[in-house]
């Protein structure tokens, strides 16, 4: 009987493969099932929020905390969670994350108050953070370098498919079962991932991984990420010049500065700054931020365009996004093969150029644009993003030493979170500014009668998301004209947002020129110093 063998990453110790345990492809299956649960949750919950608001008589702020509490917990703890995997083993960390995510999902479904839901959503975010870096860490230490891209490609395809399925599955569950089912669905998926993980995954950790925790570094980094992400989340509502926004962003800068100073002096740092002496790793991190800025920030407006301008239901809008996600699902494994053969640089540059072209194409959409042209830009965007998601992840993870595989996975996920939050906030401000500039002129050109300042402000606010408010004091005969003014104002703002997103994607294409995959013998141990307390262990 043949035995599967491959070159293991240097400095990694794990239990020898036996049966299914420790085999690369079964490991990918087990990891993918767990990550599928997190990816599905990232889009499915948004569909349930209106039903939760109505059923529990929640305020808009309460519902926002259901989403923001999860996002904050996730963003704050990703790198620390990756460090836990490096220290205690990625298998154990992943399984704790899976079990905790499933249990908190069940608790949310059983909750009878918004406060309880928010608490469990925060816990859910913490457990989700345990899973994602550990998943990449397990792939890094299980797959040989020549097949890692393919594994990441399939993993990315699963994430894309689950994300795409979220609105469709969520809409069906909310409509036919209830909002609780959106969370209960994680329980059987979590049990499947837990059983698969217990049977298949093997303990894997780097022999040279530090044995202590940089508590000061954890506190400073967590505080910096919290202030940064929260400031970006609230900036559109508070205003960029508001003292609260400036205060949180200033606190983030100070905390990051303190974290950098701490890491430069720590014996066993949370995230060794020497990692960033690797130009490809640094470029990959910047590229991930820029990609998320343009993609997530731009995609934020697509939902409003489909639902508020074209009048689609959440399920229908999810279906119309399938050309985008379908190309990502198909393209991710193919991209893994191409990158394995030719390296990441070329595919990443081409991918970001396609992304820029598709975003600029979407900037030309009008209120009456057909779904054919919209789908064309979605297909092009999916083809562009597929190699970027795979290649950037591989560049970051493969250029970090094996003992920091979890930290590298957390860095990759954190870069995406920060980029997405920054893109949504900045493009949202540009969108609102453009709508505010063109709305009065379009109102006057349409010869609509004057309304009171409060009603005019409410209509303009609705126009920022393409929603047509009730006519209010306007005579009913003006309803059609009001709709045209609102939609044309929204389209103008969306066009500017997509234009800027495309420009950022073009900058990302230039950054991609500095990326490459690390060779197995290229990274000398002294480039990433090992603490004296752990040197020589093994």
From Swiss-Prot:
Keywords of this entry: Antibiotic biosynthesis, Antibiotic resistance, Cell membrane, Membrane, Transmembrane, Transmembrane helix, Transport
Role of this protein: Resistance to tetracenomycin C by an active tetracenomycin C efflux system which is probably energized by transmembrane electrochemical gradients.
Recorded superkingdom: Bacteria
Protein name: Tetracenomycin C resistance and export protein
UniProt key word Membrane: yes
InterPro entries linked: EmrB-like, MFS, MFS_dom, MFS_trans_sf
Organismal lineage: Bacteria, Bacillati, Actinomycetota, Actinomycetes, Kitasatosporales
Annotated family: Belongs to the major facilitator superfamily. EmrB family.
Subcellular location, principal: membrane
PANTHER family cross-referenced by the UniProt entry: EXPORT PROTEIN, MAJOR FACILITATOR SUPERFAMILY MULTIDRUG TRANSPORTER MFSC
Originating organism: Streptomyces glaucescens
Membrane-spanning parts: 28-48, 65-85, 100-120, 126-146, 154-174, 181-201, 213-233, 239-259, 286-306, 319-339, 342-362, 371-391, 413-433, 494-514
Subcellular localization, as worded in the UniProt entry: Cell membrane
MF annotations from Gene Ontology: transmembrane transporter activity
Pathway assignment: Antibiotic biosynthesis; tetracenomycin C biosynthesis
Membrane topology: Multi-pass membrane protein
Biological process according to GO: antibiotic biosynthetic process; response to antibiotic
